[in-house]
Amino acid sequence: MLFSGGQYSPVGRPEEVLLIYKIFLVIICFHVILVTSLKENGNSSLLSPSAESSLVSLIPYSNGTPDAASEVLSTLNKTEKSKITIVKTFNASGVKSQRNICNLSSLCNDSVFFRGEIVFQHDEDHNVTQNQDTANGTFAGVLSLSELKRSELNKTLQTLSETYFIVCATAEAQSTVNCTFTVKLNETMNVCAMMVTFQTVQIRPMEQCCCSPRTPCPSSPEELEKLQCELQDPIVCLADQPHGPPLSSSSKPVVPQATIISHVASDFSLAEPLDHALMTPSTPSLTQESNLPSPQPTIPLASSPATDLPVQSVVVSSLPQTDLSHTLSPVQSSIPSPTTPAPSVPTELVTISTPPGETVVNTSTVSDLEAQVSQMEKALSLGSLEPNLAGEMVNRVSKLLHSPPALLAPLAQRLLKVVDAIGLQLNFSSTTISLTSPSLALAVIRVNASNFNTTTFAAQDPTNLQVSLETPPPENSIGAITLPSSLMNNLPANDVELASRIQFNFFETPALFQDPSLENLTLISYVISSSVTNMTIKNLTRNVTVALKHINPSPDDLTVKCVFWDLGRNGGKGGWSSDGCSVKDKRMNETICTCSHLTSFGILLDLSRTSLPPSQMMALTFITYIGCGLSSIFLSVTLVTYIAFEKIRRDYPSKILIQLCAALLLLNLIFLLDSWIALYNTRGFCIAVAVFLHYFLLVSFTWMGLEAFHMYLALVKVFNTYIRKYILKFCIVGWGIPAVVVSIVLTISPDNYGIGSYGKFPNGTPDDFCWINSNVVFYITVVGYFCVIFLLNVSMFIVVLVQLCRIKKKKQLGAQRKTSIQDLRSIAGLTFLLGITWGFAFFAWGPVNVTFMYLFAIFNTLQGFFIFIFYCAAKENVRKQWRRYLCCGKLRLAENSDWSKTATNGLKKQTVNQGVSSSSNSLQSSCNSTNSTTLLVNSDCSVHASGNGNASTERNGVSFSVQNGDVCLHDLTGKQHMFSDKEDSCNGKSRIALRRTSKRGSLHFIEQM
């Protein structure tokens, strides 16, 4: 018609040419639409219903082939039935979209990845070939599968992708094959067509994403295994144009998490069971069962053998497995077999690898981790947990432990509770069960609380985590915990029945134990924990022993701390605490701890201070032992002198000095014996030595404080204080209070004392010492106790200095030089008598710590020697006693020579001496026949107005003394009063009480005592 129309019309008319052109365009458009429709019909025909065949895999076009992502492979045997189960479906995390074209190069910088997981579950009528391995009693194979089908699967994945990762495991008890695969699509693949194919057959990938522009793409199966998609806008293809360009969604669509079970016929399987445990994700929230329409494939691979594309490496390994995980590391569990009590079914891992590339960064988000943790919590809330599901959860937690710490921190406490709940709700029939994964190991033991024996849990080989319940633990353990047999002795009666199982956990990575409050401390070990049926176990009579290897070797000169994870710290977020734990032994690669409770344990390295080098430690050790030895000798001489010569120990200060010297002597002797006793490593003996060392240290501190208290009475109270049985009460306080403190510590737990290592000598020998093991006990009963005494003594020391300054103002100019020397001697004597040198310990840190440690070691270990110098050798009355009874010849002093001289010249030379003597730091009286060690009035025959040896040192005060029955009273105006007393007033029990009634120095006798 068109042609004939042309006969009757002028050929060159423009209207006709335009009409012809339009008609031609319409025809071309119809042809394009027709071709597109035919292609869509072809794809639909592939998915037409059929009861005799099933979909098991997808075949995309290879590079350079037209779009065939919707074509399906394999016509399957009609007689064999199987179930294809999509165990888990994750929310699709897609890629940035382009609106013009749909190939991968426009969407991603490299490739798109799809991850899927399927379970082949055979029906009862399916013949399963089982090969019994008589050597080890395990099943060497579950399914007898042909190499042809394996080749078909390999070819399918190779055609679909540049590289892929697949791992399958067999479970004998369930007669299933579980496979997880990850495919890296070719760059020329049509993404939308691939998505349409997945949606049509109702199978979604577990994950769907592309490489992040900031990170390189995986290029090997190992990297594909660790791939986690970065959350981006998902791919959204137009509904009416499934092959058209994808659209970018502003928000991620919510894809329901479901388990889709499809009953189809299949004769496809793997040639061999695969040696890798696959982790089946947690219990799904929705289960859907449907019959898939069977497609009519255009390329039936089952009809002819297919040749595998060349691959570069195949990794095959075998290990007894039944747990499911899509990680490369082996996972162990125990699932009973129908024919054997606890079979261990070997599996085989097949890895098709390509040239290795760069590592992919974990790109999960908090919402992803939150969803996975919530799923596990929901499954645990249902009650009893079967071993296979427990193994899956352990593997899931193990995988989450490698998430970025910043993302994992908000969920750390919940994950710890999930791990505890797994062991608490685990249902098993045997006595013990253990579940291991690459980063987490869990073991549960059934126990009888009334008959509990010592139990040990150990973990081995961090690269292939294994557990052991042998006692003692294996030598190659990276972490072990030993529970004493007395663990449950103190449980309440209603808790004994509940204590039916003990759970052990081992964390290969400390991701769940991040403490932001740590400043100069860092975790250097693995983490191990133990619990008894989710009960609180503390204040044990015998401590738990924990041995942990260091992740990296630590130098011997660094300080470590044994700590446990306290859930209540940092506002409920958890944190490390050392309460109840102490270091028992430290080596370069391992630390052994003892703790009085059960929880999660670890080792912290103290970076705040660096310990001294071994050579410095050796020098300080020698100084300490030499100083203690010298002090012991001279303290003994001081004690013998004051005990042997009755005339120099009649006053109260001398008696107080005797008690202090006795305490210091016993302290030094026990300290010298301590290291030698520690070599025998006898627990009871070592505890006894530590107890006595603690006791005599507190006694020494207490008597130093009593010296200061006596000075307070002499200076402040003066005449107005009288204390009956003065020394007896001092003895009760000085020896009794330390005994009460030590008794309380022993009552709480004898294990607060024990052997500990305090460094090493240059030859590597450990410096073991019997001392306090608990930091809490040490800081309260030693540091706190000493701080109180030290503050009292420093205050008293300042008061004495003030008094010396007042006295010096009243001195005549000619005598100042002499009194200045006496003042210095008095100050030095008080410094050692009151233990002021112990204050060097407060400065033994920072850049000057070495200097002050040497000062501390020298002055404190020689405290006994300095007491001998200032309170024996420097005292004139003591030297006279030595000359009278110990010397001979010209050095010997006549027994009554000093008494006659004093009687003749005493009245002529009496002057008020307001200086402080070098031996007693007190005012000297000219009536000093024996020159005793009173603190402020230095007179052997001094009458103490209050019965305590007190005398006034004020401007109008009065000092007095007794000489051979005569009492000499001196006021500061130089007047002298004499009276007779028939009783010996030099015995410290004067019957005269005096009271100052005016500032002029007048005295009144108020009563006789």
Swiss-Prot record:
Entry's free-text remark on domains: The Stachel sequence (also named stalk) in the C-terminal part of the extracellular domain (ECD) functions as a tethered agonist. In the inactivated receptor, the Stachel sequence (also named stalk) is embedded in the GAIN-B domain, where it adopts a beta-strand conformation. On activation, the Stachel moves into the 7 transmembrane region and adopts a twisted hook-shaped configuration that forms contacts within the receptor, leading to coupling of a G-alpha protein, which activates signaling.
Name of the featured protein: Adhesion G-protein coupled receptor G2
Gene responsible for this protein: Adgrg2
Assembly and interaction partners: Heterodimer of 2 chains generated by proteolytic processing; the large extracellular N-terminal fragment and the membrane-bound C-terminal fragment predominantly remain associated and non-covalently linked. Interacts with CFTR.
Leader peptide range in chain numbering: 1-37
Gene Ontology, cellular component aspect: apical plasma membrane; cytosol
Protein's organism: Mus musculus
Activity: how regulated: Forms a heterodimer of 2 chains generated by proteolytic processing that remain associated through non-covalent interactions mediated by the GAIN-B domain. In the inactivated receptor, the Stachel sequence (also named stalk) is embedded in the GAIN-B domain, where it adopts a beta-strand conformation. On activation, the Stachel moves into the 7 transmembrane region and adopts a twisted hook-shaped configuration that forms contacts within the receptor, leading to coupling of a G-alpha protein, which activates signaling.
Segments on the Extracellular side according to the record's topology features: 38-617, 680-683, 752-776, 846-850
